[in-house]
Every structure is written in C-alpha cells, then in structure tokens.
C-alpha cells in the first residue's frame, strides 16, 4: 500500500514544488487529526526495505532496481532487497533514504515475515505509476521540442520551454530512483525517461523544483499567451486577447529556469476579448 506521507509529498511536489509537507494522522472519529508530522523532499541516494515488528525496526536492506519499464502513461519500477540477518516481522516498509537516513516512506505491506542467516528473505517490490492522458503533452513532433523563451507571443517568461509527452514521469522518478540520470541512462537508455533526462537540465538542488508557476493558453492549435499562476495553488487568471471557442490550457512546471509543458487540458469555456477568466490546476493521487 502506498503510504500517506508519500501521497502527500508527491501531491505537493507535482503542484507547488519543493516545500515542507504536513502529514496528518487521524483519530477514529476522523473529525480531528491526532498528530501531524512534516517531511521535506530531497533526492534519495537509495531505496531501503525496513522490516518491523510492532513498529520496531528489526532489519534493513538496501534495494537495487531490477527492471524499469515505461510505456505511454505507465512507469513500472521493480526493486529487489535481500535480508541476511535473523528476524521475525509483521511489516515491511519501503523508504527513500540518503545513506542510512530515512527521508520518506513510499509504501508498506503487512504479513508474517522471517529471515535467518541460513535462509535469507528476499523481497521483490514493484511500484506501478499510471498517469492520466492530461499529462500527454505533445508539440506535434515525435521527439523533444525545446524553445528559447520568450518565444512567439509568450513574452512574459525567460529561459527554456520543453515539450514532450509525460514529462511528469521525470518528476516522479526523482522521488523513486536514486542517482536518477546515471541509473536510467546507463541501464535503460532507450526509455522515454532517458530522453527526458538527457534534455532537461539536472536540478542541482531540490529547491529548484518550483512547481506549476506559469501556463500557456491556446485557441485551437495556436498558442496565444503565457501567464503566471497565483495564490500558490495553481490558479490561472486569463484576460483574453482573442475570442475563442476551442480553449486549451497547458500548465508549465518550472525547474530552475526551465519550464516543462506538463499538463494539457481543454477548457469548457468561451473566451471573449477583454474578459477575465480563472482556471485552477490540481493533481489527484490515489
């Protein structure tokens, strides 16, 4: 089962970018939370399996990536860890770690687990990521399309704009794949994810993941203007410069001075010149 803290972390990272994330634990009444903890994203150096009995750590083992598969909107990562010490446990958790320091819990499974020095316990764990077609942003070509900003009528942004389907996989990979560029490009160079890593400048710090900071809108297939978002929640305010009955909104995720064309969605609204409209972006993770 995917952990509550990983869902909270990913929800924040995919919209607001790098931030301190609150994780709430609720009482049985569900009317008030009983405790709150905070996690802050960092790039993991490893993925660790942690065996627990009654919540107490019994053993740990660093995992290796056995396979990485990407097809359309699906990304599947399989990990393998082997415990070499003796223990009994009723829970195994998967953590992203830096060294041996646990950053955030990714997933958890309960059951009856035993290991010994003579009979090692091996755990194979697959995380399947399936994202909606809203993330399938294409520039019309089969490869990556990059623009220097400002470009065309998008004059309010500077830096670089990159368009390629399912760039969301890159952001998710930062949370699940240690040494992301090295791991993917050396072992799986033919995946779209490897193409993304070769094209998008590697962030030197997690603080460069700034979230959805801007958006473009297009009328038909013609990009019109770029705007910033407001209120730290991905709200787009459009003052229309054209009459438009076929509106498409493209959210731009910012990494440093690079913008990723990240989500694309038609909007059921007719724009009239001079009128202002609002549109809100969000991500649901389940």
Swiss-Prot record:
Protein name listed in UniProt: Uncharacterized protein ORF286a
Organism phylogeny: Viruses, Adnaviria, Zilligvirae, Taleaviricota, Tokiviricetes
Organism: Acidianus filamentous virus 2 (isolate Italy/Pozzuoli)
Signal sequence bounds: 1-19
Lineage: superkingdom: Viruses
Keywords: Signal
């Amino acid at each position: 089962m995917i952990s509550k803290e990983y869902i909270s972390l990913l929800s924040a990272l995919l919209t607001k970018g790098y931030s301190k994330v609150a994780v709430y634990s609720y009482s049985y009444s569900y009317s008030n939370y009983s405790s709150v903890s905070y996690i802050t994203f960092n790039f993991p150096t490893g993925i660790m399996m942690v065996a627990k009995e009654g919540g107490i750590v019994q053993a740990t083992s660093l995992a290796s990536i056995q396979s990485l598969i990407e097809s359309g909107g699906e990304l599947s990562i399989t990990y393998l860890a082997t415990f070499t010490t003796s223990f009994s446990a009723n829970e195994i958790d998967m953590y992203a770690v830096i060294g041996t320091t646990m950053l955030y819990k990714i997933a958890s499974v309960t059951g009856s687990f035993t290991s010994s020095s003579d009979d090692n316990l091996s755990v194979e764990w697959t995380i399947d990521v399936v994202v909606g077609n809203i993330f399938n942003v294409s520039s019309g070509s089969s490869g990556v399309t990059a623009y220097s900003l400002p470009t065309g009528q998008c004059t309010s942004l500077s830096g670089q704009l990159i368009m390629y389907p399912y760039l969301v996989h890159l952001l998710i990979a930062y949370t699940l794949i240690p040494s992301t560029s090295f791991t993917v490009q050396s072992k799986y160079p033919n995946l779209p994810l490897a193409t993304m890593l070769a094209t998008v400048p590697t962030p030197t710090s997690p603080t460069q993941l700034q979230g959805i900071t801007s958006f473009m809108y297009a009328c038909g297939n013609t990009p019109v203007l770029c705007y910033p978002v407001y209120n730290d929640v991905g709200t787009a305010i459009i003052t229309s410069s054209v009459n438009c009955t076929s509106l498409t909104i493209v959210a731009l995720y910012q990494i440093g001075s690079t913008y990723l064309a990240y989500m694309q969605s038609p909007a059921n609204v007719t724009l009239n010149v001079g009128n202002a409209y609002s549109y809100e972006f969000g991500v649901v993770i389940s």
